[in-house]
């Protein structure tokens, strides 16, 4: 009884497997479905994945470029004593300098003057509290772009 039951189960399994195997075989042997499906599936997958990869790489590149630019700008400022205009001159956007160049002398003065000012103000603030209110009121105009233009 058990042998015949096993045979009937195996025959049933074969019976259920053969139509399932015939279904995909019929689809695979059909040249039109085989030619149309993979080209539609693969480009869709690539199109869905490529923009995400491009945006991700673009974000990384922007972050890296901005970090490198800021590092290079600060290194150039510290080592060569350049102003920001000297660093920004080789830019590919000359239309931006139409508004920057008239301000170049004031910007250069603003960039050169605050560099000596912050260390003494920090020293005076930590050394004596009596000079703190005057330095607090005098230091913000030196950092603001309009402060020096009004003083000069």
UniProtKB/Swiss-Prot annotation:
Annotated InterPro entries: SEEK1
Pfam families named among the record's database cross-references: SEEK1
Polar residues bias: start-end ranges: 1-31
Region annotation (Disordered) ranges: 1-42
Tissue-specific expression: Expressed in skin. Also found in heart, placenta, liver, skeletal muscle and pancreas.
Protein's UniProt name: Psoriasis susceptibility 1 candidate gene 1 protein
Natural source organism: Homo sapiens (Human)
Originating gene: PSORS1C1
């Amino acid at each position: 009884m058990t042998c015949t039951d096993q045979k009937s189960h195996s025959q049933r399994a074969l019976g259920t497997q053969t139509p399932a195997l015939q279904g995909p075989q019929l689809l695979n042997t059909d040249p039109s479905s085989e030619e149309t499906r993979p080209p539609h599936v693969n480009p869709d997958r690539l199109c869905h994945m490529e923009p995400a990869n491009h945006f991700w790489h673009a974000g990384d590149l922007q972050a890296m470029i901005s970090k490198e630019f800021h590092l290079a700008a600060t290194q150039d400022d510290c080592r060569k004593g350049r102003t920001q205009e000297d660093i920004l001159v080789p830019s590919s956007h000359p239309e931006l300098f139409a508004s920057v160049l008239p301000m170049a002398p004031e910007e250069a003065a603003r960039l050169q003057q605050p560099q000596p000012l912050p260390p003494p103000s920090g020293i005076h603030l930590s050394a004596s509290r009596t000079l703190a209110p005057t330095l607090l009121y005098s230091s913000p105009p030196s950092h603001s772009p309009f402060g020096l233009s009004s003083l000069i």
